[in-house]
């Protein structure tokens, strides 16, 4: 009821959230209540999916204005970290598996190059407005050897990159830009997997089965390059949302959400 009846009542969505005469027949049929494996999905009384496969024909139209929305500035030489001041420590975004909250770590500059658990995170303004690029550090993605890219980055949906190699980060950025937006995994100069999202850089125009297959390939590729997160692109998508504690990054730089201030990468001791 917490996921069905209660929300429907809270938002006064009459006819939703329950199984009774007069209610819309939006139903799930599950194998059992422990594993909660979904076998059938009904929408308005019609069978919509069986064992994870969507059954309805899919058609859709979208305006030309939501195409060609990725306009990147020059990247060369702009995805490196600023040089640290003497005796400075770096503000590092620490992510947690399956959570959108982050922690702010302070790591001495001398320890950064020696750590294989840190990666660069960059936000690149992609709407052709100001050409901003901000670069920081992130911990929690695992021991990456390559780069991840995504144009899904709440709420401004700029391009976000996480990686350990500058050339791989640039290639990942070019890959999603050429597709009109999307997700990509790159390592050692090769694109291992990608999913084009040409509708505003946020949505695919492919059928659900194709999107599901490509999304699974992305996750497998991310694991192959050392990513330890179960949902890396979901985690990435919230790193640029500067309203959730503690530390975020936008195209204007790092944001200390507890103070609602833009802060430098390097903090003096």
Where are the language model's segments positioned?
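Active-site microenvironment of metallo-dependent hydrolases
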Residues: 1-269
């Amino acid at each position: 009821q917490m996921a069905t009846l209660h929300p429907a009542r809270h938002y006064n969505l009459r006819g939703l959230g329950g199984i009774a005469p007069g209610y819309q027949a939006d139903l799930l049929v599950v194998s059992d209540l422990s594993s909660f494996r979904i076998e059938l999905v009904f929408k308005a009384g019609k069978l919509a999916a069986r064992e994870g496969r969507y059954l309805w024909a899919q058609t859709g139209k979208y305006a030309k204005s939501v195409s060609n929305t990725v306009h990147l500035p020059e990247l060369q030489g702009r995805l490196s970290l600023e040089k640290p001041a003497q005796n400075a420590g770096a503000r590092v975004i620490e992510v947690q598996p399956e959570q959108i909250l982050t922690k702010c770590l302070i790591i001495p500059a001398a320890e950064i190059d020696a750590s294989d658990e840190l990666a660069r995170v960059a936000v690149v303004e992609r709407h052709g407005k100001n050409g901003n690029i901000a670069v920081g550090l992130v911990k929690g993605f695992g021991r990456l050897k390559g780069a991840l890219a995504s144009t899904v980055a709440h709420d401004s949906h700029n391009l976000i990159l996480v990686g350990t190699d500058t050339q791989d980060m640039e290639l990942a950025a070019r890959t999603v830009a050429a597709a009109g937006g999307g997700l990509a995994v790159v390592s050692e100069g090769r694109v291992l997997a990608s999913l084009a999202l040409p509708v505003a850089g946020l949505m695919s125009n492919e059928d659900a089965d194709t999107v599901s297959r490509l999304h699974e390939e992305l996750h497998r590729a991310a694991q192959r390059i050392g990513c330890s997160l179960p949902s890396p692109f979901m985690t990435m998508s919230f790193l640029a949302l500067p309203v959730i504690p503690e530390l975020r990054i936008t195209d204007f730089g790092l944001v200390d959400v507890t103070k609602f201030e833009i802060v430098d990468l390097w903090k003096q001791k």
